[in-house]
Amino acid sequence: MTGSFDGFIAIDWSGATGKRYQGIAIAECGPGNGAPILISPPESNRPWTRTQVLEWLDWRIGQGGRSLIGIDCAFSLPFDTAASYFQQDTATVFDLWDLVERVCQADLDLFGGAFPRHPAHASGYWTSGARPEGLVLGRRATEDVCRADGTGSPESPYKLIGAKQVGKGALAGMRLLRALRLRRDDVAVWPFEPTEGRSTLVEIYPRLFLMRTGWGLRKVRTWSDLNGCLALLDSDGVDASAPVPTDHDTDALVSAAGLRWLCRNPGVWSPAGLNERAQRQEGWIFGVGAPH
Protein backbone atom coordinates (compact mmCIF):
# COMPACT_ATOMS: atom_id res chain seq x y z
CA MET A 1 0.00 0.00 0.00
CA THR A 2 1.21 3.52 -0.69
CA GLY A 3 -1.20 5.31 1.64
CA SER A 4 -4.22 7.40 0.81
CA PHE A 5 -4.66 10.16 -1.74
CA ASP A 6 -6.56 13.42 -1.52
CA GLY A 7 -7.18 13.79 -5.24
CA PHE A 8 -7.08 11.86 -8.50
CA ILE A 9 -5.99 13.56 -11.73
CA ALA A 10 -6.00 12.06 -15.22
CA ILE A 11 -4.37 13.58 -18.29
CA ASP A 12 -5.21 12.52 -21.82
CA TRP A 13 -1.90 13.44 -23.43
CA SER A 14 -0.61 14.34 -26.89
CA GLY A 15 2.82 14.27 -28.48
CA ALA A 16 1.61 15.87 -31.71
CA THR A 17 3.42 18.48 -33.74
CA GLY A 18 2.08 22.00 -33.35
CA LYS A 19 1.49 24.70 -30.77
CA ARG A 20 -1.81 23.61 -29.19
CA TYR A 21 -3.47 20.24 -29.06
CA GLN A 22 -7.12 19.23 -29.13
CA GLY A 23 -5.90 15.86 -27.87
CA ILE A 24 -5.07 17.06 -24.36
CA ALA A 25 -7.72 16.90 -21.63
CA ILE A 26 -7.41 16.96 -17.84
CA ALA A 27 -9.95 15.71 -15.29
CA GLU A 28 -9.90 15.53 -11.51
CA CYS A 29 -11.95 14.01 -8.72
CA GLY A 30 -11.65 13.84 -4.96
CA PRO A 31 -11.92 10.83 -2.64
CA GLY A 32 -15.33 9.29 -2.16
CA ASN A 33 -17.73 8.96 -5.07
CA GLY A 34 -18.13 12.49 -6.41
CA ALA A 35 -18.18 12.99 -10.16
CA PRO A 36 -14.92 13.92 -11.88
CA ILE A 37 -14.68 17.36 -13.46
CA LEU A 38 -12.84 18.63 -16.51
CA ILE A 39 -10.12 21.22 -15.91
CA SER A 40 -10.29 24.12 -18.37
CA PRO A 41 -7.11 25.33 -20.08
CA PRO A 42 -5.74 28.65 -18.78
CA GLU A 43 -6.99 30.32 -21.95
CA SER A 44 -10.45 28.77 -21.88
CA ASN A 45 -11.15 29.43 -25.56
CA ARG A 46 -7.90 27.78 -26.69
CA PRO A 47 -6.66 24.19 -26.26
CA TRP A 48 -3.90 23.19 -23.87
CA THR A 49 -0.21 23.36 -24.71
CA ARG A 50 2.12 20.80 -23.14
CA THR A 51 3.99 23.54 -21.30
CA GLN A 52 0.70 24.72 -19.81
CA VAL A 53 0.09 21.19 -18.53
CA LEU A 54 3.51 21.28 -16.85
CA GLU A 55 2.76 24.66 -15.30
CA TRP A 56 -0.67 23.52 -14.12
CA LEU A 57 0.72 20.33 -12.54
CA ASP A 58 3.42 22.32 -10.76
CA TRP A 59 0.77 24.71 -9.44
CA ARG A 60 -1.74 22.00 -8.53
CA ILE A 61 0.74 19.90 -6.57
CA GLY A 62 1.85 23.05 -4.79
CA GLN A 63 -1.69 23.60 -3.51
CA GLY A 64 -1.14 20.82 -0.99
CA GLY A 65 -2.66 17.43 -0.45
CA ARG A 66 -1.44 14.23 -2.01
CA SER A 67 -2.56 13.49 -5.56
CA LEU A 68 -2.44 10.37 -7.70
CA ILE A 69 -1.79 11.63 -11.22
CA GLY A 70 -2.22 9.41 -14.27
CA ILE A 71 -0.86 10.36 -17.69
CA ASP A 72 -1.86 8.49 -20.83
CA CYS A 73 1.60 7.90 -22.26
CA ALA A 74 4.42 5.41 -21.96
CA PHE A 75 6.93 6.59 -19.36
CA SER A 76 9.82 4.71 -20.97
CA LEU A 77 10.93 2.58 -23.90
CA PRO A 78 11.54 -1.16 -24.21
CA PHE A 79 15.12 -1.61 -22.99
CA ASP A 80 15.85 -4.52 -25.31
CA THR A 81 16.27 -1.67 -27.79
CA ALA A 82 16.92 1.37 -25.59
CA ALA A 83 19.84 -0.26 -23.76
CA SER A 84 21.89 0.18 -26.94
CA TYR A 85 21.81 3.96 -26.39
CA PHE A 86 24.10 3.63 -23.37
CA GLN A 87 27.62 2.34 -22.89
CA GLN A 88 26.92 1.09 -19.38
CA ASP A 89 24.39 -1.62 -18.60
CA THR A 90 23.32 0.14 -15.41
CA ALA A 91 21.31 2.84 -17.22
CA THR A 92 17.96 3.69 -15.65
CA VAL A 93 14.81 5.37 -16.91
CA PHE A 94 16.18 8.66 -15.59
CA ASP A 95 19.23 8.28 -17.84
CA LEU A 96 16.86 7.74 -20.75
CA TRP A 97 14.90 10.89 -19.88
CA ASP A 98 18.14 12.88 -19.71
CA LEU A 99 19.16 11.53 -23.11
CA VAL A 100 15.79 12.38 -24.68
CA GLU A 101 16.06 15.91 -23.26
CA ARG A 102 19.57 16.44 -24.63
CA VAL A 103 18.54 15.31 -28.09
CA CYS A 104 15.22 17.22 -28.11
CA GLN A 105 16.11 20.39 -26.20
CA ALA A 106 15.66 22.55 -29.31
CA ASP A 107 12.14 21.17 -29.87
CA LEU A 108 9.58 23.62 -28.51
CA ASP A 109 6.80 22.79 -26.03
CA LEU A 110 8.26 19.47 -24.86
CA PHE A 111 8.04 17.97 -28.36
CA GLY A 112 10.09 14.80 -28.83
CA GLY A 113 10.42 14.77 -32.60
CA ALA A 114 14.20 15.04 -32.76
CA PHE A 115 14.80 11.75 -30.97
CA PRO A 116 13.54 9.28 -33.61
CA ARG A 117 15.26 11.36 -36.31
CA HIS A 118 18.64 11.15 -34.59
CA PRO A 119 20.90 8.67 -36.40
CA ALA A 120 21.95 7.01 -33.14
CA HIS A 121 18.35 6.25 -32.13
CA ALA A 122 16.29 6.03 -35.32
CA SER A 123 16.76 2.36 -36.17
CA GLY A 124 14.18 0.99 -33.71
CA TYR A 125 11.34 3.25 -34.90
CA TRP A 126 8.70 2.72 -37.54
CA THR A 127 8.17 6.27 -38.78
CA SER A 128 6.59 6.09 -42.24
CA GLY A 129 5.45 3.88 -45.11
CA ALA A 130 5.21 0.12 -44.98
CA ARG A 131 6.75 -1.61 -42.02
CA PRO A 132 10.42 -2.21 -42.84
CA GLU A 133 11.21 -5.84 -43.50
CA GLY A 134 12.66 -7.49 -40.44
CA LEU A 135 11.76 -4.65 -38.07
CA VAL A 136 10.53 -5.99 -34.75
CA LEU A 137 8.95 -3.23 -32.70
CA GLY A 138 10.07 -3.52 -29.11
CA ARG A 139 7.44 -3.94 -26.41
CA ARG A 140 7.77 -3.63 -22.68
CA ALA A 141 6.71 -6.37 -20.29
CA THR A 142 3.71 -4.31 -19.18
CA GLU A 143 2.35 -4.16 -22.73
CA ASP A 144 2.66 -7.93 -23.08
CA VAL A 145 0.96 -8.56 -19.72
CA CYS A 146 -1.84 -6.14 -20.62
CA ARG A 147 -2.56 -8.09 -23.79
CA ALA A 148 -2.39 -11.41 -21.97
CA ASP A 149 -4.76 -10.09 -19.29
CA GLY A 150 -7.32 -9.12 -21.91
CA THR A 151 -7.41 -5.54 -20.64
CA GLY A 152 -6.25 -3.91 -23.86
CA SER A 153 -3.75 -3.90 -26.69
CA PRO A 154 -1.30 -1.04 -26.07
CA GLU A 155 1.00 -0.25 -28.97
CA SER A 156 4.79 -0.29 -28.90
CA PRO A 157 6.35 3.09 -28.06
CA TYR A 158 8.51 2.55 -31.14
CA LYS A 159 5.50 2.86 -33.45
CA LEU A 160 5.25 6.38 -34.90
CA ILE A 161 2.76 5.74 -37.68
CA GLY A 162 -1.02 5.38 -37.79
CA ALA A 163 -3.91 6.61 -35.69
CA LYS A 164 -2.97 4.47 -32.69
CA GLN A 165 0.72 5.36 -32.58
CA VAL A 166 1.95 6.28 -29.12
CA GLY A 167 5.64 6.97 -29.62
CA LYS A 168 5.45 10.75 -29.93
CA GLY A 169 3.34 11.02 -26.81
CA ALA A 170 5.83 8.86 -24.92
CA LEU A 171 8.80 11.07 -25.81
CA ALA A 172 6.91 14.27 -24.96
CA GLY A 173 5.75 12.65 -21.73
CA MET A 174 9.31 11.78 -20.73
CA ARG A 175 10.28 15.43 -21.16
CA LEU A 176 7.28 16.49 -19.05
CA LEU A 177 8.10 14.06 -16.25
CA ARG A 178 11.75 15.07 -16.19
CA ALA A 179 10.87 18.77 -16.06
CA LEU A 180 8.34 18.28 -13.26
CA ARG A 181 10.80 16.29 -11.13
CA LEU A 182 13.38 19.06 -11.54
CA ARG A 183 10.85 21.57 -10.23
CA ARG A 184 9.52 19.58 -7.30
CA ASP A 185 10.95 17.23 -4.70
CA ASP A 186 7.51 16.25 -3.41
CA VAL A 187 6.53 14.08 -6.38
CA ALA A 188 7.40 10.50 -7.23
CA VAL A 189 7.09 8.56 -10.47
CA TRP A 190 5.88 4.99 -9.95
CA PRO A 191 7.32 2.36 -10.09
CA PHE A 192 10.75 3.96 -10.37
CA GLU A 193 11.03 5.53 -6.91
CA PRO A 194 9.46 5.39 -3.44
CA THR A 195 6.05 7.04 -3.33
CA GLU A 196 5.16 7.17 0.37
CA GLY A 197 3.84 10.58 1.39
CA ARG A 198 4.30 12.16 -2.03
CA SER A 199 2.06 12.98 -4.94
CA THR A 200 2.54 10.13 -7.37
CA LEU A 201 2.61 10.00 -11.17
CA VAL A 202 1.57 6.78 -12.87
CA GLU A 203 1.26 5.67 -16.47
CA ILE A 204 -2.33 4.96 -17.50
CA TYR A 205 -4.12 3.31 -20.40
CA PRO A 206 -7.75 4.56 -20.40
CA ARG A 207 -9.20 1.48 -22.07
CA LEU A 208 -7.97 -0.65 -19.17
CA PHE A 209 -10.49 0.92 -16.78
CA LEU A 210 -13.34 0.15 -19.16
CA MET A 211 -12.17 -3.40 -19.76
CA ARG A 212 -11.85 -4.13 -16.04
CA THR A 213 -15.39 -2.93 -15.35
CA GLY A 214 -16.91 -4.98 -18.18
CA TRP A 215 -17.65 -2.04 -20.49
CA GLY A 216 -15.31 -3.65 -22.99
CA LEU A 217 -14.32 -2.15 -26.33
CA ARG A 218 -17.47 -0.11 -26.87
CA LYS A 219 -16.96 3.57 -27.61
CA VAL A 220 -18.10 6.17 -25.10
CA ARG A 221 -20.00 8.52 -27.41
CA THR A 222 -22.49 10.37 -25.21
CA TRP A 223 -22.84 11.71 -21.70
CA SER A 224 -25.23 8.84 -21.05
CA ASP A 225 -22.53 6.36 -22.07
CA LEU A 226 -20.02 8.17 -19.90
CA ASN A 227 -22.28 8.12 -16.86
CA GLY A 228 -22.82 4.41 -17.40
CA CYS A 229 -19.05 3.91 -17.28
CA LEU A 230 -18.71 6.12 -14.22
CA ALA A 231 -21.37 4.10 -12.41
CA LEU A 232 -19.31 0.95 -13.02
CA LEU A 233 -16.40 2.79 -11.39
CA ASP A 234 -18.50 3.60 -8.30
CA SER A 235 -18.65 7.26 -9.30
CA ASP A 236 -21.48 9.74 -9.48
CA GLY A 237 -22.38 10.90 -12.97
CA VAL A 238 -21.54 14.21 -14.62
CA ASP A 239 -23.89 16.94 -15.79
CA ALA A 240 -25.22 15.70 -19.12
CA SER A 241 -26.44 19.07 -20.41
CA ALA A 242 -23.17 20.13 -22.06
CA PRO A 243 -22.35 19.56 -25.75
CA VAL A 244 -21.37 16.06 -26.87
CA PRO A 245 -18.05 15.17 -25.23
CA THR A 246 -14.88 14.51 -27.19
CA ASP A 247 -13.04 11.21 -26.94
CA HIS A 248 -10.32 13.06 -25.05
CA ASP A 249 -12.81 14.43 -22.51
CA THR A 250 -14.31 11.02 -21.84
CA ASP A 251 -10.88 9.35 -21.58
CA ALA A 252 -9.80 11.89 -18.96
CA LEU A 253 -13.05 11.70 -16.97
CA VAL A 254 -13.17 7.90 -16.98
CA SER A 255 -9.49 7.71 -16.05
CA ALA A 256 -9.79 10.09 -13.09
CA ALA A 257 -12.64 8.02 -11.66
CA GLY A 258 -10.80 4.85 -12.66
CA LEU A 259 -7.68 5.84 -10.72
CA ARG A 260 -9.77 6.38 -7.60
CA TRP A 261 -11.61 3.08 -8.09
CA LEU A 262 -8.48 1.06 -8.87
CA CYS A 263 -6.55 2.57 -5.98
CA ARG A 264 -8.91 0.78 -3.58
CA ASN A 265 -7.29 -2.49 -4.68
CA PRO A 266 -4.03 -2.83 -2.69
CA GLY A 267 -2.70 -5.34 -5.22
CA VAL A 268 -2.41 -2.61 -7.85
CA TRP A 269 0.94 -1.54 -6.36
CA SER A 270 2.55 -4.99 -6.61
CA PRO A 271 1.15 -6.50 -9.82
CA ALA A 272 2.16 -9.82 -11.29
CA GLY A 273 5.03 -9.28 -13.71
CA LEU A 274 6.46 -6.12 -12.13
CA ASN A 275 10.08 -7.23 -12.31
CA GLU A 276 13.38 -5.46 -11.62
CA ARG A 277 13.69 -4.18 -15.18
CA ALA A 278 10.22 -2.63 -15.02
CA GLN A 279 11.01 -0.96 -11.70
CA ARG A 280 14.35 0.42 -12.88
CA GLN A 281 14.02 0.99 -16.61
CA GLU A 282 10.76 0.26 -18.43
CA GLY A 283 7.95 1.23 -16.09
CA TRP A 284 4.46 -0.21 -15.78
CA ILE A 285 0.90 0.67 -16.77
CA PHE A 286 -1.08 1.26 -13.58
CA GLY A 287 -3.59 -1.55 -13.13
CA VAL A 288 -1.98 -4.09 -15.46
CA GLY A 289 -1.49 -7.41 -13.72
CA ALA A 290 -3.42 -6.34 -10.62
CA PRO A 291 -5.84 -8.89 -9.17
CA HIS A 292 -9.48 -8.45 -10.18
Residue ranges with predicted function:
Residues 2-9, 13-292:
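RNase H-like (RuvC/DEDD) metal-dependent nuclease/polynucleotide-processing core
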